[in-house]
Amino acid sequence: MGARASVLRGDKLDTWESIRLKSRGRKKYLIKHLVWAGSELQRFAMNPGLMENVEGCWKIILQLQPSVDIGSPEIISLFNTICVLYCVHAGERVQDTEEAVKIVKMKLTVQKNNSTATSSGQRQNAGEKEETVPPSGNTGNTGRATETPSGSRLYPVITDAQGVARHQPISPRTLNAWVRVIEEKGFNPEVIPMFSALSEGATPYDLNSMLNAVGEHQAAMQMLKEVINEEAAEWDRAHPAHAGPQQAGMLREPTGADIAGTTSTLQEQVLWMTTPQAQGGVPVGDIYKRWIILGLNKLVRMYSPVSILDIKQGPKEPFRDYVDRFYKTIRAEQASQPVKTWMTETLLVQNANPDCKHILKALGQGATLEEMLTACQGVGGPSHKAKILAEAMASATAGGVNMLQGGKRPPLKKGQLQCFNCGKVGHTARNCRAPRKKGCWRCGQEGHQMKDCTTRNNSTGVNFLGKRTPLWGCRPGNFVQNTPEKGKAQEQETAQTPVVPTAPPLEMTMKGGFSLKSIFGSDQ
């Protein structure tokens, strides 16, 4: 820690600790920031000792600058810290990190302009003049390697300091990425844009290297070769060979086999791609790339036979997942862009589930995809399911209560109270001004409660529902109930039928008086 923190001493350390991290912030740079920068440089396989002087900081800046735009926040923070350290070593007075970064970027721009002017002068002295080749085909590429502001072409065809175009082989990392995509994705629709990105500006030699690197799916590779052969034969029919002698200074016109890299050398391919079309140049790399993409489209249709008409949203599927499947399938459809636009506007709403379809139709025809996703965000999710279940249970509960109460009462608004004494809305039974209902559950009369009731006649007893019941309760429903009507009918039948005695009268039984002889025998 001490070695990394010792890159600044004395006045430079005081200047370092006076610079703010942000333009309007209170925090300032400390020694721990130097220690962190040294650790990050060592993690990125760079020498932390370069932080001790201006030249070393500038080398670090040149190394980190290309990665700032696409790098992680750690790389950006490291670049900003090194910029501040460079200004401290160079004696530049800065107040915060933003000013230091502006100064460094300004110096980088000046250095880049100087190198551009130097290389332009060298090209003028050498008498080299290059023309821009217009785009060809549907790929939108120029048919030659992309040129930088300094005039040097980028990978895979680059231009050295002498202005000579030479080929740089495709990197193993690119081949590994392509093979991994084929192994993981197969021939899904996303393979085509991945191939187009990895083969940007490639020569037919590089494209054949990418195809030969695929170990699996040899049947698909054979079908791809058949498509390439058909396109090559069509090229030969459209561009027959000239019978006359070749003009001086003009390149020979490539055949279909030359474009496919079968009968042409790498040097000829580079010349065709770098020579202007007025002098016989042909963008063989872009043409061959277009043929391969046609074959990949055929493989995608065969390996992904799902039609866009079969993509429908499930009853419980979130709308976002349905949209992902829809656009993934329409990406593989071999149709023009207007047809795909019509499919998107029509089928996306038509194949949605009833809940989402009801919401999407309410949005109208001109709704954007963002508005659709926002409107259908909760449909199909746990919250939407809970809401539907709560509504169903609420309706079922309300129906059950109405059935038990024998009628449908007017619904109460939220926050309203209902009195249990008078049945009116707006107060409770405690604050009710109406006379309180009092009555005995046994006899049904007001003025006393059941515990004070003196009535013992079961025929007049009532329960709390107002129905008459015996004092000891009533029988279950599956037993024969003794109602007052049945008791009266039995009394009438008894009165009409004469009673015939079956024993002698009581007077004859008591005629002899009372005696215990029959009990104790003859001991009396």
From Swiss-Prot:
Single GO BP term: viral translational frameshifting
Lipidated positions per record (N-myristoyl glycine): 2
Disordered: region residues: 113-153
Site (Cleavage): 155-156, 389-390, 403-404, 463-464, 479-480
SUPFAM superfamilies cross-referenced by the UniProt entry: Retroviral matrix proteins, Retrovirus capsid dimerization domain-like, Retrovirus capsid protein, N-terminal core domain, Retrovirus zinc finger-like domains
Coiled-coil stretches noted in the UniProt entry, renumbered to this chain: none
Disulfide bonds: none
GO MF terms, alphabetically ordered: RNA binding; structural molecule activity; zinc ion binding
Source organism superkingdom: Viruses
Composition bias type Polar residues, residue spans: 113-125, 135-151
Entries under Pfam families matching the protein: Gag_p17, Gag_p24, Gag_p24_C, zf-CCHC
Residue span of motif PTAP/PSAP motif: 501-504
UniProt motif (Nuclear localization signal) ranges: 26-32
Swiss-Prot/TrEMBL keywords: Capsid protein, Host cell membrane, Host cytoplasm, Host membrane, Host nucleus, Host-virus interaction, Lipoprotein, Membrane, Metal-binding, Myristate, Phosphoprotein, Repeat, RNA-binding, Viral budding, Viral budding via the host ESCRT complexes, Viral nucleoprotein, Viral release from host cell, Virion, Zinc, Zinc-finger
PROSITE patterns documented for this protein: ZF_CCHC (PS50158)
Alphabetized PANTHER family for the sequence: ENDOGENOUS RETROVIRUS GROUP K MEMBER 24 GAG POLYPROTEIN-RELATED, IGE-BINDING PROTEIN
Domain notes: Late-budding domains (L domains) are short sequence motifs essential for viral particle budding. They recruit proteins of the host ESCRT machinery (Endosomal Sorting Complex Required for Transport) or ESCRT-associated proteins. p6-gag contains one L domain: a PTAP/PSAP motif, which interacts with the UEV domain of TSG101.
Physiological role: Matrix protein p17 targets Gag and Gag-Pol polyproteins to the plasma membrane via a multipartite membrane binding signal, that includes its myristoylated N-terminus. Also mediates nuclear localization of the preintegration complex. Implicated in the release from host cell mediated by Vpu. Capsid protein p24 forms the conical core of the virus that encapsulates the genomic RNA-nucleocapsid complex.
Family, as annotated: Belongs to the primate lentivirus group gag polyprotein family.
UniProt name for this protein: Gag polyprotein
Organism this protein belongs to: Simian immunodeficiency virus (isolate TAN1)
Lineage summary: Viruses, Riboviria, Pararnavirae, Artverviricota, Revtraviricetes
